[in-house]
C-alpha cells in the first residue's frame, strides 16, 4: 500500500481544484487553432503521484542539501529538464545562499524552477494560458495574437479582408470593420449598408435627390445647374457658351437661337446654326422679253414716256395686246398739258374707261365687256376727224365725238405726249380720280404706226419691265419685300358709351414657295411687333423641325398649327383675336394653344394696349426690327391674297409696296414634266 500523499501533493491537488473551479465559473471558448495548440501532443511528466514523488526527491536532494547535476538528473530522469534546471539552481544559490543557510527564498526559488511557466514567459496581453513542458513551455494565444510568446499581433485583415465587406482596420490583438462614406455598419459588425440620404428632404433643397450606392446626387432639369452652397437649381446661360451662330436669347432653363430672316436665313436642323431659306416649291418665273409690265412703278408714275413731234397734223393710232386680273388702273395717257387736251384710257371695275379733256371740258365714258379675266385681248384707240373709236378684239365698244385734235401745234410743230402705265400729272387733276397703279401686261404694241421701236430695246435690257409668261389670279411675293397699310382695329360702340372694342381677323389664302416667312404682322412705332402670323419650319420650345403656322403676340407664340407648306396646294389660314380669344386655323383645322389661360389673357391685354396706339399693318415681311421681336422675320415667298376684318386687301391701295410684288397676278407652280 503506497504511502499517503505528502503536504506538497495535497497543496498541488488543492491548487488544481481551485484552478478548475475558477475556469468553470468563467467559460472560455477557444478557437480551433488555440484548442489545437492546447491539446498538442507533448512529452508529459509522470502521473501526479510521480510528480509529487519527484517534488519530494527534489526537496530532499536539492533543497535540504546541495545536489550535483547527476543527482538532479536522478530527480528529473531526463536531460531537457535537467539542462533547464541545474543552471538556474546554481543561480538560486548565488542569490539566496546555500541550503544549509535555511533561507526560505532559496527554497521557494528552487521549488519553482521545474514549472517553466513560473514566472510566466508569455506575453500577458496576447496569452490565454501558458503550458509547462519538459524544459520548455508553450504559450496558447488569444484571438488576434501569435508568435512563441504571443506577443506578435495577427493582421486579420490580410485574409479575406477580415470578413469585412468594405474596410478592415487592424488593431493590436483585434480588428474592426468600417464603411466608406455613405454607408453604415450593420448589426453583424461586418456588412456595410447604403445610407439613403434622400430621406432627408433638406439634402438637396429645391433640387431632386437621387440616392446612389454610398452617395447621392442632386438633379436639376436640363438648362439648370445645381448650387451646393444655396441648394437650388440655377439657370445656365447657354449664350455665354457661344452656342448660336448669330443671335442668342437666354431663357429660364433654355435658350433660343435666331437668324437674320430678312437676310434670307433660318435655323438649321441643329437649332444653333443658320442656313439659307430655299424654295421648296418651284414657280414658273419665266418672263417674256416681248412684254411690258405696267405695274413696276408703285408710285403710279408711267413706266414709259414718249414724245412725238410732227411737221404735219397727225392723228393718234394706238393698238396693243393686253392682259390683267387688276380691276382698276391706267393703261396710257395721250395729249398735252393737264389743262389742255388729253385722253386717259384706264380700267374701272374691270371695264374700259376713257377720261378726256378737250379745250378745258372734261368727260368720262365707260363701255364694253369686263376684260380683267387674265386672258389676252387686242385693244385699239383710233383718232378720226371728229371721233375717237375704241375697239376690243376688233369690236368697237366706244365711239366718242370730240372737238379738237390731240396733237397740239406749238412753235411750228405738232406735239403729242404719250405715257404708258401712268399719267404725267396728279390724280386730282383727272376728270374723276382713279388709282393709276395697274398690274397688267402689254405686248405687240403699235404707237403711231411703229415709230416707237426704242421701247422694245429698253424692255429687252430690263427684266423688271417684263411680264411673267404665264400668270394666275393672286398676289406674288418674291421673298424680298413687303407692303404696308394704315388700318384701324379698334372701334367705339355707341351702345356702350365710350368703351373701345377691338378685333383682328385675318384670312390668308396662300400657295407658298418656301417654308419660312411672315404672312401678316402689326408693327408699332417703337418697332414692337404686337401680332405676327408666319410660316416657320421648327417648334421653338420643343426644338423640333416641323412645318407650322405660328400666331404670336410680340415674341410669344399663342398657337401653332401644322401645314403641308411644300405640297404646291393652296391653303387657307384663318386668325381671330378679340377679348379673351385667340384662334388659329389651317384649312379648317384648329391649331394648338401654346399658352395657359392666364398667359393668354396677359398677352391679349398687351395686344389691346398696342392697338390703342399707332400700328402699321405689314404684309409679306417686316421692317428692320430686332430678330427677337417676333418668331419669324423672314420675307414671305409665294402667292397670297388677304382679307382683314372682312375686307380684301388690294395691294394697289397700300401705303407702300415693294416694286417686285405683283398686286393681282401670280406665276403658277411649275410642275415637273414626266
UniProtKB/Swiss-Prot annotation:
Principal location: secreted
Record keywords: Calcium, Disulfide bond, EGF-like domain, Gamma-carboxyglutamic acid, Glycoprotein, Growth regulation, Metal-binding, Phosphoprotein, Repeat, Secreted, Signal
Cell location: Secreted
Gene3D superfamilies the UniProt entry points to: 2.60.120.200, Coagulation Factor IX, Laminin
Modified residues (Phosphothreonine): 609, 617, 633
Binding site for Ca(2+): 326, 328, 437, 652
Residue span(s) of domain EGF-like: 113-151, 153-193, 194-234, 235-275
Function as written in the Swiss-Prot or TrEMBL entry: Ligand for tyrosine-protein kinase receptors AXL, TYRO3 and MER whose signaling is implicated in cell growth and survival, cell adhesion and cell migration. GAS6/AXL signaling plays a role in various processes such as endothelial cell survival during acidification by preventing apoptosis, optimal cytokine signaling during human natural killer cell development, hepatic regeneration, gonadotropin-releasing hormone neuron survival and migration, platelet activation, or regulation of thrombotic responses.
Modified residues (Phosphoserine): 68, 614
Subunit structure: Heterodimer and heterotetramer with AXL.
Keyword Repeat appears in the UniProt entry: yes
Protein name: Growth arrest-specific protein 6
Gene: Gas6
BP GO terms, sorted: activation of protein kinase B activity; animal organ regeneration; apoptotic cell clearance; apoptotic process; B cell chemotaxis; blood coagulation; calcium ion transmembrane transport; cell-substrate adhesion
Pfam families, sorted: cEGF (PF12662), Gla (PF00594), Laminin_G_1 (PF00054), Laminin_G_2 (PF02210)
GO molecular function: calcium ion binding; cysteine-type endopeptidase inhibitor activity involved in apoptotic process; phosphatidylserine binding; protein-macromolecule adaptor activity; receptor ligand activity; receptor tyrosine kinase binding; signaling receptor binding
GO cellular component: cytoplasm; extracellular space
Cysteines engaged in disulfide bonds, as pairs: 62-67, 117-130, 122-139, 141-150, 157-168, 164-177, 179-192, 198-209, 204-218, 220-233, 239-248, 244-257, 259-274, 280-566, 441-467, 639-666
PTM note: Gamma-carboxyglutamate residues are formed by vitamin K dependent carboxylation. These residues are essential for the binding of calcium.
Domain Laminin G-like: 295-467, 474-666
Signal peptide annotation: 1-27
Residues recorded with modification Phosphotyrosine: 636
